[in-house]
């Protein structure tokens, strides 16, 4: 049994901020009490705030670390992934669904990045050194004829927890017409 006691904390609950003590046992909150704890084995937060971690269900932040500028693919996946993890945990996010695009319309480098990003995710998770829990969200672009061929090799990835179907076809809610689509992509190069 692993137990951690946080005391003298401002605990953020769904209804209020209370001053008190929080006990975590085996990774789960087991009690929240008003007042300080007198236990010898405790962490005194000296009035600092303590809140549950946030869950991010969809972020494109990982792609920004692999493609920091248009047409630039970061050469090493693991350092890019750890940089992403540092930003995520610094934001208070303890569980993140890293969204990766499976398919694209314009060569923005996402296809080249896809396998590298999933490989880095698997490598980093296996080290046990990630500070947030990273799960995989594959966004399958239905209008890309390569989508199925890209998706199936990734479908048995242990971290895969969410799959969504996306339709960014011009005129289908993403752009009001083909002219808007052309304007958007003319600014990428």
Locate the predicted segments by residue.
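N-terminal metal-binding scaffold of metallo-dependent hydrolase/deaminase domains
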Residues: 1-38
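Conserved acidic residues
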Residues: 3, 40, 94, 161
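Short, acidic, Ser/Thr-enriched surface-loop or helix-capping motifs
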Residues: 6, 24, 44-45, 56
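Divalent metal-coordination and catalytic microenvironments
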Residues: 9, 27, 47, 58, ...
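Active-site metal-binding motif and surrounding structural segment of the metallo-beta-lactamase
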Residues: 36-51
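Metal-associated gating/positioning segment near the N- to mid-region
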Residues: 48-116
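Metal-coordinating catalytic core of metallo-dependent amide/deamination hydrolases
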Residues: 103-107, 112-189
């Amino acid at each position: 049994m692993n137990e951690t006691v946080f005391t003298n904390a401002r605990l953020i609950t769904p209804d209020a901020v209370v001053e008190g003590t929080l006990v975590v046992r085996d990774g789960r909150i087991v009690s929240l009490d008003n007042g300080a704890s007198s236990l010898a084995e405790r962490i005194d937060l000296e009035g600092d705030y303590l809140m549950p971690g946030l869950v991010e269900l969809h972020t494109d932040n990982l792609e920004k670390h692999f493609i920091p500028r248009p047409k630039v693919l970061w050469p090493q996946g693991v350092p890019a992934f750890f940089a992403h993890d540092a930003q995520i945990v610094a934001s208070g996010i303890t569980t993140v669904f890293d969204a990766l695009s499976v398919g694209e319309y314009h060569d923005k480098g996402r296809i080249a990045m896809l396998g590298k990003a999933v490989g880095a995710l698997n490598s980093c998770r296996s080290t046990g050194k990630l500070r947030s829990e990273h799960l995989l969200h594959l966004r399958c672009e239905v209008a890309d004829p390569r989508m199925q061929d890209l998706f199936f090799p990734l479908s048995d990835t242990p971290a895969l927890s969410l799959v969504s179907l996306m339709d960014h076809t011009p005129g289908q809610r993403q752009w009001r017409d083909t002219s808007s689509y052309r304007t958007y992509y003319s600014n990428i190069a």
